[in-house]
Amino acid sequence: QNLKVPTFPKNSSEFESAEVRYSSMNLGDNITNNFDGIYDTQYKLDKDGFVTLVIADEIPELREKAEIAGYNFMPWTLPGNKGYLIYRNLLTKGGKTAPYSLNKTPMPNFTTNRSHLISHDAKKYIGAYAPTGLRMTKDEYLSDFGGFNDKFRE
């Protein structure tokens, strides 16, 4: 996952100047179990304010590669191979008009469009602030992050 995150407070004196009060990425399932998560003050940000999050099996060489690259690592702890990645940001400065407001992304209508993933791609509504992901094999990841750096920095 890769996304630009709004600024968040490092302490209570920054509440008024930060773009959001809190943001997090959580890994869960369809019955709302939360298996793991990372929140804003834990993020490793790159020089452009982006967070790159590697979600993979807890294998030392996978974690180490992410850490050496300066990426965040979250172990895949869900049973099976399906899960939900939930991105949250709370109390947005600027409200619904802020470029990073999740309120800009409409709720999907499951009655008329069961596969709402394309029509409701958050990137259409909040641009670089939307999480973007790329699935790859272990070998692809170990060789060059599955081409991740090229695909998301174009």
Identify what each model region corresponds to.
Residues 1-154:
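A compositional/structural signature for long, glycine/proline-rich flexible linkers
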